[in-house]
């Protein structure tokens, strides 16, 4: 499956620790942000985007991916995890995070080994394909 940039949207954003609510998506401010994120994803779909790339990070990446997975139940969407290297976030124990990665249509690793430059390479990979 080739990635068609004209039909591809990518997500990246803040990690939970940079939001006042942290990982508590039940917080009213978090719920408002998630509704806005879903609205933007729905607009992208209305604009003919069908493939969604996310960087596999906690926070905005994971929340956007979860929304796409929910919408994918009724729409022909593709979700691809673009990880910087194998084992990225292997220490994360949150079930929802692991389930999101596992439910992705594809998982790609940009670099073969862990190194700091892999994070920027992951971001560049997503930008170049969306």
Protein language model annotation of sequence segments:
Residues 1-130:
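Acidic/glycine-enriched connector segments
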